[in-house]
Amino acid sequence: MSLLQLLQQETGKIGLLIDPDKTNARCDLTKLIEKCNQSIVDYLLIGGSKVQTGDFHNVIQHVKSISKKPIIIFPGDAKQVSKYGDALLFLQLISGRNPDYLIEQQVKSAQAVIDSGIECIPTSYVLLDGENNSSVAKVSQTTPIKQTELDIILSTALAGQLLGHQLLYLEAGSGAKVPVSLETIQLIKSKTKQALIVGGGIKKIETIQAMQALGVNLIVIGTAFEENPSFFEVLPKEQ
């Protein structure tokens, strides 16, 4: 079974986002993965906005050698492709209008993705306002959609579905003060057919449980682990 099929069939799963930019040494990364192996985290997502190609390959290869969890590449740019991942999210930032992230990065990476043989999953990437100036907004030079603009969020998600994207990733941004709202999730789940990934600003167990109850397929957590390593120990099991 492909990783996409797993994501489509499962709900309430937990993903750990690892940004190699924030991992200062291999020993720190090793400790993180070893702890993750003993936790109920289901997937590892790896990617960052400033990682050099060689470093990225090395990180993916190292994590693959010690991880018991599937590795999903969450690329920050066209250079972040590696055969050592289990799947790659082929992202299109459809919430913005910067052509570099609508088509240019995809064109640059296409041959490398094919040559790697990695499972490639077309993914709508929709940036929502998490009430912070996120690194995604800075790097992509795009403006997040306000979370009160539900009709625009829905129309954007449906456009991605019509473009043939298999996954929808709603992103409030790393360290967001406000995560993707439950109202937004409920609307998207009721009106779209794509498997749903939600990330950004998720720091409370209650938020995770509420998202699980609404049928989010994959809940991505990053900053909460960075700020509180014991977060591994209190993660809730799927409802």
Predicted features and spans:
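Glycine/Thr-rich beta-alpha phosphate-binding loop at enzyme active sites
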Residues: 139-184, 226, 231-232
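Catalytic cores of alpha/beta
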Residues: 73, 77-91, 190-221
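N-terminal amphipathic alpha-helix/helix-capping segment at the start of soluble metabolic enzymes
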Residues: 1-23, 109-122, 129
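Conserved anion-binding
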Residues: 80-161
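Surface-exposed amphipathic alpha-helices with a cationic face
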Residues: 7-8, 37, 57-68, 161, ...
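Active-site mouth loops of central-metabolism enzymes
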Residues: 12-29, 74-77, 127-153, 198, ...
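Hydrophobic faces of well-ordered beta-strands that scaffold small-molecule active sites
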Residues: 14-19, 44-46, 71-73, 88-90, ...
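Glycine-rich phosphate-binding active-site loops on the catalytic face of alpha/beta enzymes
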Residues: 46-51, 87, 91-102, 172-175, ...
